[in-house]
């Protein structure tokens, strides 16, 4: 994890939309740093997708976020979706 990184945001988004996107980024961070509740993570992703419906824009934001933070949105989402557990984390230990 990198310290003091910036979130990739679109300045044309409303405050509410920015909040939804930041909430999802925070869920991704939590996935890597501790653990997330699967249901809350997926709800946050659904809200994120309402703001960012385009796959292309989602991939670009994901790349920008990973470059900045070291955390992969794609990997986090896939692992959470595939998990049968209520709580999921990147740490397999």
Curated annotation (Swiss-Prot):
Pfam families: UPF0223. Belongs to the UPF0223 family. This is UPF0223 protein llmg_0515. The lineage of its organism: Bacteria, Bacillati, Bacillota, Bacilli, Lactobacillales.
């Amino acid at each position: 994890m990198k310290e003091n990184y910036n979130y990739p945001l679109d300045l044309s988004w409303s405050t509410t939309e920015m909040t939804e996107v930041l909430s999802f980024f925070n869920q991704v961070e939590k996935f890597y740093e501790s653990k997330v509740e699967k249901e809350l993570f997926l709800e946050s992703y659904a809200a994120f997708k309402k703001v960012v419906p385009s796959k292309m824009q989602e991939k670009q934001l994901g790349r920008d976020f990973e470059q900045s933070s070291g955390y992969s949105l794609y990997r986090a989402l896939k692992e959470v979706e595939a998990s049968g557990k209520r709580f999921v984390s990147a740490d397999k230990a």
